[in-house]
Amino acid sequence: MSSLYTLRAAAQYDRRLESKKGSGWVEHKLERKGERGNTHYCSEFDISKGAKILQLVQIGNTEVGRTFLEGNRFVRANIFEIIRKTMVGRLGYDFESELWVCRNCDKTSEKYFKKCDCGETYYYSERNLMRTMNDLMYQFDMTPSEINSVDLEYLANAVDYAEQLVKRSQVPEPVELAMMEPIVASGEGILMVSEPEVMPVTTKVEEAWTIQIGEIPVPLVVIKETPVISGVEGTLNSTGFSLEADITKLVEKEILQEEVKEAVHLALEVGNEIAEKKPELKLIPYWSASLELHKRIRKHKEHAKIAAIQVQKEREKDQKVFSALELRLNLKSRRRNQAVVCDKRGTLKWETQRGHKKSKLMQQASDFVVTQIHCDFGCKTQYSEPHIPGIKQSTSKKICKPRKHSRIVGNSKINYIMKNLCDTIIERGIPVELVTKRCKRRILQKEGRSYVQLRHMNGIRARQDVSSSPDMELLFTQFCKFLVGHKPLKSKNLTFGSSGLIFKPKFADNVGRYFGDYFVVRGRLGGKLFDGRSKLARSVYAKMDQYNDVAEKFWLGFNRAFLRHRKPTDHTCTSDMDVTMCGEVAALATIILFPCHKITCNTCMSKVKGRVIDEVGEDLNCELERLRETLSAYGGSFGHVSTLLDQLNRVLNARNMNDGAFKEIAKKIDEKKESPWTHMTTINNTLYKGSLATGYEFERASNSLREIVRWHLKRTESIKAGSVESFRNKRSGKAHFNPALTCDNQLDKNGNFLWGERQYHAKRFFANYFEKIDHSKGYEYYSQRQNPNGIRKIAIGNLVFSTNLERFRQQMVEHHIDQGPITRECIALRNNNYVHVCSCVTLDDGTPATSELKTPTKNHIVLGNSGDPKYVDLPTLESDSMYIAKKGYCYMNIFLAMLINIPENEAKDFTKRVRDLVGSKLGEWPTMLDVATCANQLVVFHPDAANAELPQILVDHRQKTMHVIDSFGSVDSGYHILKANTVNQLIQFARDPLDSEMKHYIVGGEFDPTTNCLHQLIRVIYKPHELRSLLRNEPYLIVIALMSPSVLLTLFNSGAVEHALNYWIKRDQDVVEVIVLVEQLCRKVTLARTILEQFNEIRQNARDLHELMDRNNKPWISYDRSLELLSVYANSQLTDEGLLKQGFSTLDPRLREAVEKNLRHSFAGRMACVKFVSKVALKVLCVQITTVFFRVFKAKRARRFKNCIRLLTEILCTRGRKSVPTASQGWG
């Protein structure tokens, strides 16, 4: 069977290796490579062409055969590829439907499948191919040589035979009237016939078997089948027929039918033999698949009968032999009462059976009295088997007869000595040395062969590899007759390791000249063997391959060093691994660790020695990746080698390749020499070195990291929750994904958003809260967005720009408004945790992210707070008109942006709710708290608006305002940016508890009147009646006075604090407690000498006031403002205290002094006004007194009195300081 297929390499690379290393080497590789499930494994079997043709005949049809014969080589190759897969995988193929078919469950597929759902597997394997070949040999009854001889002519004949199928004649028969009786089974199994019913029945058309002899079809016997009768229910009364007789007749008919079929096939075979043996008759032999199958089955039955007869004869023969032996040994009687027993060791042997105790039944009887006990102590005679003596089976004693030895005389003595000496040498493996007058030759024994010690085995290259002389050759030839003899050896099998081998060459061997009858192997050149005793030219022995066993020397040194230097073991070592595989793995490890072409080459070793550590790691990684697949092919037995090499690779290649990070860190640290920068530099340098760093450098890096951890821990402990210094709120680098703007159903062909029905309902926004821009007024008319607290300039004027580049750049210049650093006002807290979406955006270093110039657009709404802005067309019915939010309604842009995410069927309800619920409640200039609350209410009705994207919201901390940016942009820049980007995030302003000052900012306008509380207090501080009314309405304005020590002391000295205490002592105890603390603080501030000391007293006592006020919640506006002021003072005190401990100073004292000086100038202005008004009032009073005096007194005294009044007036107005009535004089 091996001649029907061969194993060949499918890859061209393996085929080239086959030409170099031989077919045996490739077969060994393919055996290791051929695993189950390898889909390319089938192409590695070169199957005989005849076998593939027979497989095609078996599974194909006439159309496939005709296509194969008439097709080109590509068609034949495709069909042969299918045939090969069916033979190697045993998966069926249907050529009509061109589908692969499972043999078990009829599953079909267009592609070859290796595993079916029913559990059958169709992997490519040599076992499947051998089974297919066996089936072909059995079905076609051919030998492997006959299958190899099958060619295309056989296929062509098979196709012709199939096309000329047996003609079958059909014999029609008319419709007959059959007697149909209903049949029922009686209880006794007898068929009874009742009244018959006549029904028409059509008999089946029978086919006649024919034999085609030449062109004459010969009909055979027509086989009639029993017609199928469908009966009707009824009873059978006839007793004329029995069931057994009918069944017997049916069986006989079936047997007769089988015999007729067999006779037909035999007749066909006879006809074919006649057509083959009588060519003169010109008869065409008959061929069909059924005939071939019947022929194979018939031969199989004959072979099976013959084999069964032979097996039966052998059984009878063996039975007779064992029966005779048993009878002769009398085993039946000897094994009586014995059985085969298996002992503990598993040995089967005969043993006597043990008697079983028989149970006895107690007879039940009535109770009676025992009067006598009788015992018979006699013993019965025990039965013993007679001893049958066995047959003597001992062997006879061997008697050695003395042998006579013939006397050795003459040369036979030397031969006798040599023979015995050689036998001893071969038996014990003893080396022997032949010595003549001027020559020596050493012969060694190895693996049952004799070898001569040659010079090249010791590394010496010479013309003659061993010394020679005539006497030595005579002795050598005579000695080799007994030492070597005539052991067969093929010279072509000699290779490396055969140096010095002694053998007797044959006549046809390709060998060089040699002396005597024996040849001493030295090497080979050009396929020719050379003797070690021959003198060769330098050109010959320099090029020849000397068959020295280098591996033996290598393993000799390896074994000697390994045994000498290995450590003692704690267990008993066993040989579990293949030595050959150990050598292969050792070679791979050598190549990976020391990449070279030859391990004995000094140049290769010099290159390996001259490598630096980086080159060693790179070479190791490269070689390991190249040979990893080969190393993994040896399985888990050598997993320790792969693990060690991988660990070594990780250690040597643990280098830091991130040069960019190293340079950036070094650049940012620059030349800073103070801690912790020096520690960071040490760690950065050590990390960059990677595995090249020494142990000392790693120790230094660990110490530096410990110092950094200490520094950071100390810094972290100094930062508490809610502090400004630790706040970071970076803006997201990715733009928000708004699904409403990316839905294809809501975009036009240009990708713009389609409002649909929302556009019609959006008119409620534009009619109530937007105004149309009048172009006749010019864009500059709308460029100033004025609010009650300030002005913001928008960039609507930049819609008209100059084509001059210089002027256009001037138009793009922004107006920067400094908002200061991040303060407590920028941060929102909830349970002492940051609420980032309700806070201002910061950069990486904690500085605020400020707005830039916003360029204008026409008829758009601008969305997005992170990434690039998104421009959506306004839902206006007039495309040429431009709309801008009315004064105080900039926040309507938020609800207009929410309309984008509202479904069209809800747009009407949404716009109505905005108009009736939001617009009516918020009005102009609402706070962010109210806007967020209304947005939360709308989300309850319209959940789709929760993810709506907001326009950018800018925060103006100076004006306590939030600006909602529309499409007209902003020229003013420098505003802080609110991080909230969606409606869900904006709603966080309306959820308590939230500690945020920005929630009270107005959206697009003026802040609460409390923003000017201090200035309002300064305006009425010299107006007793107005100050009395203000402190009764807003008692916590006294706490606001802590912003300026001058204002605080003025209130205290004027008696306003005492008056407020007397007023509120009967009305609110919480307010009284706060006023009492403020009065005590005023006494402490009075003792302070400088402004800095006064501020320190206020800030040190701010926390106590804050804790006292934080216990309650008061309805006054000044309460929230004073609470926030105290919180700022308390936090700034903690921050400055930490900085002062670290040795840093702040600019806050200088700032406070400057502000206080400014407030004192305001006080001076107020005081000047009061003095001026007092002077005028005094002069008017004096004039009135003079007039009255002139009327009452005499005229002569009027002049004198007038001078006295003028002098008194001058004294009071210019010098008298107590002439002006103070505020304290007005409280009564």
Swiss-Prot record:
Listed PROSITE patterns: HC_PRO_CPD (PS51744), PV_P1_PRO (PS51871)
Peptidase C6 domain mapped to chain residues: 882-1004
Residue window of motif Involved in interaction with stylet and aphid transmission: 598-601
Domain Peptidase S30, chain residue ranges per copy: 408-547
UniProt EC number: 3.4.21.-, 3.4.22.45
Motif mapping: Involved in virions binding and aphid transmission: 856-858
Pfam (any one): Peptidase_C6
Post-translational modification: Potyviral RNA is expressed as two polyproteins which undergo post-translational proteolytic processing. Genome polyprotein is processed by NIa-pro, P1 and HC-pro proteinases resulting in the production of at least ten individual proteins. P3N-PIPO is cleaved by P1 and HC-pro proteinases resulting in the production of three individual proteins. The P1 proteinase and the HC-pro cleave only their respective C-termini autocatalytically.
One function term, GO molecular function aspect: cysteine-type endopeptidase activity
Coiled coil regions in record: none
Entry keyword set: Host cell junction, Host-virus interaction, Hydrolase, Inhibition of host innate immune response by virus, Protease, Serine protease, Suppressor of RNA silencing, Transport, Viral immunoevasion, Viral movement protein
UniProt keyword Plastid, yes or no: no
Active site (record annotation): 456 (for p1 proteinase activity), 465 (for p1 proteinase activity), 499 (for p1 proteinase activity), 890 (for helper component proteinase activity), 963 (for helper component proteinase activity)
Residues flagged as site, Cleavage: 547-548, 1004-1005
Secretion signal span: none
One of the GO BP terms on file: transport of virus in host, cell to cell
GO CC term (a single one): host cell plasmodesma
Family: Belongs to the potyviridae P3N-PIPO polyprotein family.
Domains as described in the record: The N-terminus of helper component proteinase is involved in interaction with stylets. The central part is involved in interaction with virions and the C-terminus is involved in cell-to cell movement of the virus.
Protein name: P3N-PIPO polyprotein
